């Protein structure tokens, strides 16, 4: 295998530009994969994982099934044992079905690949697909245990016991059967541990939910109770039989009666020798567990006879034994009253030790499962308590505390305590981009500024966008602060206002709605050819009117995108930026208002000059000079704007007309307010404060090349 | 301290003659130092002194002295192993000691029981206890030969601290601190009492000595149990944990639980025997009748003379002391008497008492119904307290071990649940969810929930480099591009390589996207295709296999002399066909390696890069196709020219074509300067691409021009 792989590495790859060659190779690969899929399986594939789960369930069912063989013998009459053949046949049938699963498991192990140890240095490792190596490895490791667990030993003993029952060795056969079942129980239990390990190794957990894990542990507990109850029942039958055997030997020793071993089998009840022996012997009085005068010490096994467990029907017998096992396992055998018999004492010690171990395991696993269910809620509760304690410790004012509580509550509703960044960061680049495209793209396209960009640019921007949450009343920017991010509003409303650098008498306020953006000074800064580290200062104060959800683009991300993608520098984006920028809109509104005031002032001066004589010549000249100065100052800007406007195409004209239509209402309101101000004092209106033209982002590509 | 330092200096300066130096260092050095002789005279004194003593002492004595005087480091391997061996022997000794409680037993028959001693059991227990005592003695000896950390604050401020190796200081410190407890634990007190008892035969002494044995064993049990606590803390201090695996820790705690049950059962047994015999004694002393009762009548070793037999016939002591019908109240000890525990064989006695202890300890003694006897009530209180403490301790430790076993699994389950909940909360489409689940599954299989970066960052630089060399170097050498580099360059690259996992169907990079890393494929297959910038009619697709690399535009960018921040755009779209495991070299790491190591600028690497770059192969394939089409067009025009020789305009067009061909030939002239290796590579390349060229159909339509890829600047002079 290694030689073939090394040869492939040495050979250079050919360029497969021909479609016919590609189609041939594809079909050949598919045929080979079909053949491969039928022969050798991947240990981490879905089919092997599914089979592991199925086999785990059947193994546990088989462990539940085997102790039913212990209920086959029962007391069928006075001083005799009998065999429940129908129960034996039923259990044998189900056990054979379980053995078929074990056989299939061995077959699957011969067809499952394994990871070569030397290739585990990097990544997941390479699979060994050679059938001979797989078989050799399996034979060296787990094959013997699997065969020992698979052998149908109880079935063989049952079919041998039924014809041998005529010999009168029923108890001997029962003991052999119990011993074989107990001995085979060990490899069958042992199989479950590597199976658990294999499932955990493949998927990371046994049970998907915490409750399933807790139920699984409880099921193991009940299984142990079931096994323990069955052993108690069988040991009780054994003690009763040994008492009968002792009395039988005593009768033979005293030579009073002839007691044959077959007398203790219920098949000999009708024989006359057996009936005579039963009438004369004292076995019933000596071996009666319900009587207090008996000499034989039954100890903990007397309960099986005082409650008629050994002679009742199967369902009642089984449920009582299960209850006995569950009771003594959960109380570590503290209710048991034993005799000094060595086997009985050892059995009780085993019950106590297993009870301690299983109880401790159950509590530990239950606690682990319950803890994992509520770990996020507990983390959040601890975090809230820490926040409250810290706010009390720092003596924050109640208004600030209320704002912090509102934000924490809002963050829980938005994220449910899950750290979104860490989840995204652990995924590969392509998946991360797909997820961020799903999360951001439909929302980002609502922002008109982004609708001008192409998909590749939008993917890069979606990768950098971070969600930003602000509660009502929060100041996102204040006038004069450095702008470190650009916000694109998705939900909520934002108030954006400016005083033009703190100038008295000037105030402009707009409401930003979903689709708008703020912090546009950052785009101007990002497109500068000289990369300065100083962030621009904000010309507006931005405050959240309601709970705002927005996407934030940080300064370094914006600079990175601006440098990487030359397509960001285009006239189309320039016009869209001017159109949707509220800063430019404010400047446009001021420009229109100044032009209108200049027009009205010129008209008034003209009318006055018509009606007045030469006596007022000096004041008219002064007003004309002022008007001329203002006209010259704005004419300079108008020239520049006009020059650039001449070069725009038809799209710009459409945008300009749309812009004019949208700002008509604002202009009317400003005109009415300005007329009111004019009535109060004409000197103030004459000295109109001038709004500076905002810096235009450099969209030209030529300067970048220089 | 100065004297010690001088001795140490003398010891280390003569390394080869360490034995002789040790032998001589006590007498002549101290004397010479006290007399303050000049240093020139010291060798003269040492040499004859060594010779004289060497001739006097035999070889065996010198070897014994050297072994005897060896000082051990408390953190060394041999002391740690001895601590383990000693703690195991302490546990075994704690298990053996309560077996002395089973030595007294009840003999005789039902009508005339008597007190007896199980001599064979006492001999056996004494033998095993003597072996355990030898371990305690050896422990004391080793403590006299183990150094300790000087308690000065100046030595322990940094690092581990300095060792004190002086035998006198070690002995003095040990005698002041732990010697008394070790001595009490070592004393063979039960052995002395047992051998003293065997010589006596009188019953009243026998009873007294039984109580003496029990009292002595119980009293010595306290220092023996106390020894385990500092021993466990020493092991924890040296290695961090007592047991290496969690299951061994759980078994250790269960073993302590069983030991407590064993001690409790044995104590219950000997108290039962004591209650039984004390009833006999009180009735015997109070009996006044025709025949007086002597205490030795209750001993199984008595003479059985006529007076004793007469007394046995008329006495009522045993009837009054019967546990079922008698007047005496046995309380919690009645079970031992009614069930004949005290008169059974040893194994039956032992296992029943173990079961009794286990039962009462795990149920906190709630089945006990006591009398008003104060000793019995105190015993029951102790059972309840110890039961509560041990049970809570067992559950707590079991839970700690279980959680340490499953902490990684629980973290993974939590992360998976968080991811599922977050995907549902954000309403990702089902196709994206399945891709995320498949990637998480693949990541679990590759890493098993362990963060490799965190593990590597916590190691020192040299270990980290060696580990990354082990992880990367054999795989990196499979990539032909790296096989041309030397070891130092490969080490630098291995340190910066990051493993990258891609599931099926993942787009690693799309045409036009920024390339941020260069991938070297280790396992899996990738499909790399290009449309030459979205041009219609052009499509090229190849399969990348283990040993190939993609993102080679990044190498051109890294070797540029001007360090521009703009990352290059990808000219190809790369998609994973199956699960891919690759090494990624990030852009900043590649630029760092290119700037630091000038050896990356070489013509050999340039030719290897051209040979293995699929970008260059694609260009070469297009170049060959264009040349072939040009040749076919020239042949066809020659035929047409031969047929139509009278038209002059076509002749002019032919001349223009000839001029264009000459220009292209001029462009190709620098390639003739390449050496023989390049020609061999080129011929191999041409042979491999012959099939691809042959499969191309002849098209009369003009082929769109494919731009020559930008060549990385491998020249070293340009950087200078």
UniProtKB/Swiss-Prot annotation, chain A:
Q: What GO biological process terms does the UniProt entry carry, in alphabetical order?
A: intracellular calcium ion homeostasis; pollen tube growth
Amino acid composition bias (Basic and acidic residues), ranges on this chain: 693-706
Localisation per UniProt entry: Cell membrane; Cytoplasmic vesicle membrane
What does the entry list under GO cellular component? Answer: apical plasma membrane; cytoplasmic vesicle membrane
Specify the domain of life of the species encoding this protein.
Eukaryota
Q: What tissue expression does the UniProt record report for this protein?
A: Expressed in pollen grains. Not detected in leaves, roots or root hairs.
Q: Which residues are in the IQ domain?
A: 585-614
User: Keyword set for this entry?
Assistant: Calmodulin-binding, cAMP, cAMP-binding, Cell membrane, cGMP, cGMP-binding, Cytoplasmic vesicle, Ion channel, Ion transport, Ligand-gated ion channel, Membrane, Nucleotide-binding, Transmembrane, Transmembrane helix, Transport
Which residues does the entry place in the Cytoplasmic compartment?
A: 1-53, 108-142, 196-217, 367-706
Note the SS bond partners: none
Which residue intervals make up region (Disordered)?
661-706
Q: What is the membrane topology here? A: Multi-pass membrane protein
One GO term in the molecular function aspect is:
calmodulin binding
- Alphabetical list of Pfam families matching this protein: cNMP_binding (PF00027), Ion_trans (PF00520)
Q: Which residues lie on this side of the membrane: Extracellular?
A: 75-86, 164-174, 239-345
Q: Spell out the InterPro entries in the cross-references.
A: cNMP-bd_dom, cNMP-bd_dom_sf, Ion_trans_dom, RmlC-like_jellyroll
- Which residues participate in a nucleoside 3',5'-cyclic phosphate binding? 449-579
Is Nucleus among this UniProt entry's keywords?
Answer: no
Where is the secretion signal located? none
Q: What happens when the gene is disrupted?
A: Male sterility.
User: What is its biological role?
Assistant: Cyclic nucleotide-gated ion channel required for directional pollen tube growth into the transmitting tract. Acts as a Ca(2+)-permeable divalent cation-selective channel inhibited by either lanthanum or gadolinium. Regulated by CPK32 to mediate Ca(2+) transport across the plasma membrane in response to Ca(2+) oscillation.
Q: Which family does it belong to?
A: Belongs to the cyclic nucleotide-gated cation channel (TC 1.A.1.5) family.
Supply the domain comment: The transmembrane domains are indispensable for pollen tube guidance.
Q: What is this protein called?
A: Cyclic nucleotide-gated ion channel 18
* Gene name of the encoded protein: CNGC18
UniProtKB/Swiss-Prot annotation, chain B:
Q: Which residues lie on this side of the membrane: Extracellular?
A: 107-121, 200-211, 274-377
Which residues are listed for a nucleoside 3',5'-cyclic phosphate binding in this entry?
481-605
IQ domain location is 617-646
Q: Identify the stretch(es) annotated as Calmodulin-binding.
A: 597-612
Which GO-annotated molecular functions does the record name?
calmodulin binding; cAMP binding; cGMP binding; voltage-gated potassium channel activity
Q: Does the keyword Iron-sulfur apply?
A: no
Q: Where are the transmembrane segments?
A: 86-106, 122-142, 179-199, 212-232, 253-273, 378-398
The UniProt keywords, alphabetically, are: Calmodulin-binding, cAMP, cAMP-binding, Cell membrane, cGMP, cGMP-binding, Ion channel, Ion transport, Ligand-gated ion channel, Membrane, Nucleotide-binding, Transmembrane, Transmembrane helix, Transport
Return the domain comment text from this UniProt entry.
The binding of calmodulin to the C-terminus might interfere with cyclic nucleotide binding and thus channel activation.
Record-given protein name: Cyclic nucleotide-gated ion channel 17
Q: Which gene encodes it?
A: CNGC17
């Amino acid at each position: 295998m290694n030689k073939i792989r090394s040869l492939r590495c040495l050979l250079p790859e050919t360029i497969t530009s021909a479609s016919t060659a590609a189609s041939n190779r594809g079909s050949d690969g598919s045929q080979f994969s079909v053949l491969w899929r039928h022969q050798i399986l991947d240990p981490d594939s879905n089919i092997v994982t599914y089979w592991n789960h199925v086999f785990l369930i059947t193994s546990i069912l088989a462990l539940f099934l085997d102790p039913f063989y212990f209920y086959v013998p029962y007391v069928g009459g006075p001083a005799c044992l009998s065999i429940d053949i129908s129960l034996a046949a039923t259990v044998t049938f189900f056990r054979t079905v379980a053995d078929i699963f074990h056989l299939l498991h061995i077959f699957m192990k011969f067809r499952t690949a394994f990871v070569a140890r030397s290739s585990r240095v990097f990544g997941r490792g390479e699979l060994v697909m050679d059938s001979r190596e797989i078989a050799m490895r399996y034979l060296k490791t787990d094959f013997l245990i699997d065969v020992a667990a698979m052998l149908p030993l109880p079935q063989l003993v049952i079919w041998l016991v039924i014809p041998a029952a005529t010999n009168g060795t029923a108890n001997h056969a029962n003991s052999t059967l119990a011993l074989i079942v107990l001995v085979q129980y060990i490899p069958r239990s042992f199989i479950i541990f590597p199976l658990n390990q294999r499932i955990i190794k493949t998927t990371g957990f046994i049970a998907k939910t915490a409750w399933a894990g807790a139920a699984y542990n409880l099921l193991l507990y009940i299984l142990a109770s079931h096994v323990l109850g069955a052993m108690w029942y069988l040991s009780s039958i054994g003690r009763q039989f040994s008492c009968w055997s002792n009395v039988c030997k005593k009768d033979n020793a005293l030579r009073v009666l002839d007691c044959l071993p077959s007398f203790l089998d219920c098949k000999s009840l009708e024989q006359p020798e057996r009936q005579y022996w039963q009438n004369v012997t004292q076995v019933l009085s000596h071996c009666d567990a319900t009587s207090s005068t008996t000499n034989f010490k039954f100890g903990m096994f007397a309960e099986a006879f005082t409650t008629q467990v050994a002679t009742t029907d199967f369902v009642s017998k089984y449920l009582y034994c299960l209850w006995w096992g569950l009771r003594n396992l959960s109380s570590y055998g503290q209710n048991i009253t034993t005799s000094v018999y060595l086997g009985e004492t050892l059995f009780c010690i085993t019950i106590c030790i297993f009870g301690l171990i299983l109880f401790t395991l159950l509590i530990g696993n239950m606690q682990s499962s319950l803890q994992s269910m509520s770990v996020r809620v507990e983390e959040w509760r601890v975090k809230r308590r820490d926040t409250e304690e810290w706010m009390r410790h720092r003596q924050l004012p109640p208004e600030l505390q209320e704002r912090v509580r509102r934000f924490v509550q809002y963050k829980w509703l938005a994220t449910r305590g899950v750290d979104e960044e860490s989840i995204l960061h652990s995924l590969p680049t392509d998946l991360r981009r797909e997820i961020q495209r799903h999360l951001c793209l439909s929302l980002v396209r609502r922002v008109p500024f982004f609708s001008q960009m192409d998909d590749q640019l939008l993917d890069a921007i979606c990768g950098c966008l971070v969600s930003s949450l602000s509660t009502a009343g929060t100041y996102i920017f204040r006038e004069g602060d450095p702008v470190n991010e650009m916000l694109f509003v998705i939900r909520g409303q934002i108030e954006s206002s400016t005083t033009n650098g703190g100038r008295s008498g000037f105030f402009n306020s707009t409401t930003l709605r979903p689709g708008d953006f703020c912090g546009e000074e950052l785009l101007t800064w990002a497109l500068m050819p000289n990369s300065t580290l100083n962030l621009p200062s904000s010309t507006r104060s931005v405050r959240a009117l309601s709970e705002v959800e927005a996407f934030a683009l940080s300064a370094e991300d914006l600079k990175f995108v601006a440098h990487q993608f030359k397509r960001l520098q285009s006239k189309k984006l320039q016009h869209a930026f001017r159109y949707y920028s509220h800063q430019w809109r404010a400047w446009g509104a001021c420009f229109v208002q100044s032009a209108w005031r200049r027009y009205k002032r010129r008209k008034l001066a003209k009318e006055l000059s018509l009606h007045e004589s030469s006596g007022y010549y000096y004041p008219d000249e002064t007003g004309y000079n002022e008007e001329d100065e203002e006209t010259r100052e704005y004419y300079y800007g108008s020239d520049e704007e006009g020059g650039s406007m001449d070069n725009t195409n038809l799209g710009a004209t459409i945008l300009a007309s749309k812009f004019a239509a949208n700002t008509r209402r604002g202009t009317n309101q400003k005109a009415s307010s300005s007329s009111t101000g004019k009535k109060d004092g004409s000197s103030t209106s004459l000295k109109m404060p001038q709004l500076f033209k905002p810096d235009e982002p450099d969209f030209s590509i030529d300067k970048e090349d220089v | 301290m100065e004297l010690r330092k001088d001795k140490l200096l003398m010891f280390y300066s003569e390394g080869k003659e360490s034995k002789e130096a040790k032998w001589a260092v006590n007498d002549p050095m101290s004397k010479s130092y006290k007399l303050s002789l000049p240093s020139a005279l010291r060798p003269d004194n040492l040499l004859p002194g060594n010779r004289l003593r060497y001739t006097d002492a035999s070889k065996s004595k010198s070897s014994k002295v050297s072994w005897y005087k060896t000082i051990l480091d408390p953190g060394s391997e041999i002391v740690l192993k001895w601590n383990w061996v000693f703690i195991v022997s302490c546990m075994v000794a704690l298990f053996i000691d309560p077996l002395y409680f089973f030595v007294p037993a009840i003999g005789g028959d039902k009508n005339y029981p008597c007190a007896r001693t199980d001599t064979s059991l006492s001999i056996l227990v004494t033998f095993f206890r003597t072996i355990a005592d030898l371990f305690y003695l050896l422990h004391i000896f080793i403590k006299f030969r183990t150094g300790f950390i000087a308690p000065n604050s100046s030595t322990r401020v940094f690092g581990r601290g300095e060792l004190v190796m002086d035998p006198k200081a070690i002995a003095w410190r040990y005698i002041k601190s732990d010697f008394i407890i070790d001595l009490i634990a070592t004393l063979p007190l039960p052995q002395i009492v047992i051998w003293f008892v065997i010589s006596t035969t009188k019953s009243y002494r026998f009873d007294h000595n039984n109580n003496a044995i029990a009292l002595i064993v119980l009293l010595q049990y306290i220092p023996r149990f106390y020894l385990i606590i500092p021993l466990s803390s020493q092991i924890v201090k040296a290695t961090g944990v007592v047991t290496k695996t969690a299951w061994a820790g759980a078994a250790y705690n269960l073993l302590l639980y069983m030991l407590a049950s064993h001690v409790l059962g044995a104590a219950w047994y000997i108290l039962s025997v004591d209650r039984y015999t004390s009833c006999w004694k009180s009735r015997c002393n109070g009996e006044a009748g025709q025949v007086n009762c002597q205490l030795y009548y209750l001993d199984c070793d008595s003479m059985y003379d006529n007076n004793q037999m007469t007394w046995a016939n008329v006495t009522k002591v045993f009837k009054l002391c019967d546990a079922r019908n008698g007047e005496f109240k046995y309380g919690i000890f009645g079970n031992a008497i009614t069930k004949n525990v005290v008169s059974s064989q040893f194994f039956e006695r032992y296992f029943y008492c173990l079961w009794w202890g286990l039962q009462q300890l795990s149920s906190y003694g709630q089945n006990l119904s006591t009398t008003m006897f104060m000793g019995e009530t105190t015993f029951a209180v102790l059972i309840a307290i110890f039961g509560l403490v041990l049970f809570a301790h067992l559950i707590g430790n079991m839970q700690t071990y279980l959680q340490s076993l499953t902490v990684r699994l629980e973290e993974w389950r939590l992360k998976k649940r968080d991811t599922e909940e977050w995907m549902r909360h954000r309403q990702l489409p089902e196709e994206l969810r399945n891709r995320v689940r498949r990637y998480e599954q693949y990541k679990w299989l590759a890493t098993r929930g362990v963060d490799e970066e965190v593990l590597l960052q916590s190691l020192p630089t040299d270990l980290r480099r060696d580990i990354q060399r082990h992880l990367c170097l054999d795989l990196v050498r499979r990539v032909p591009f790296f096989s041309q580099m030397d070891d130092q360059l490969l080490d630098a690259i291995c340190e910066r390589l990051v493993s990258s996992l891609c599931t099926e169907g993942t787009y690693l990079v799309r045409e036009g996207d920024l390339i941020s890393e260069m991938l070297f494929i280790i396992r899996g297959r990738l499909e790399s295709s290009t449309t030459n910038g979205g041009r219609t009619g052009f499509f090229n697709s190849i399969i990348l296999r283990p040993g190939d690399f993609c993102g080679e535009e990044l190498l051109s960018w890294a070797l540029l002399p001007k360090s521009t921040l703009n990352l290059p755009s990808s000219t190809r779209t790369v998609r994973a066909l199956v699960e891919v495991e690759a090494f990624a070299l990030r852009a900043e790491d590649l630029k760092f390696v290119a700037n630091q190591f000038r050896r990356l600028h070489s013509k050999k690497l340039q030719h290897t890069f051209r040979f293995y770059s699929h970008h260059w192969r694609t260009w070469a394939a297009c170049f060959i196709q264009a040349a072939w089409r040009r040749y076919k067009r020239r042949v066809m025009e020659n035929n047409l020219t031969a047929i139509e020789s009278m038209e002059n305009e076509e002749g002019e067009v032919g001349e223009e074509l000839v001029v264009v061909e000459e220009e292209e030939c001029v462009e190709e002239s620098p390639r003739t300067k390449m050496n023989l290796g390049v020609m061999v590579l080129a011929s191999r390349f041409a042979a491999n691409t012959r099939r691809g060229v042959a499969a191309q159909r002849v098209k009369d339509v003009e082929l769109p021009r494919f731009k020559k890829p930008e060549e990385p600047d491998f020249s070293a002079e340009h950087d200078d």
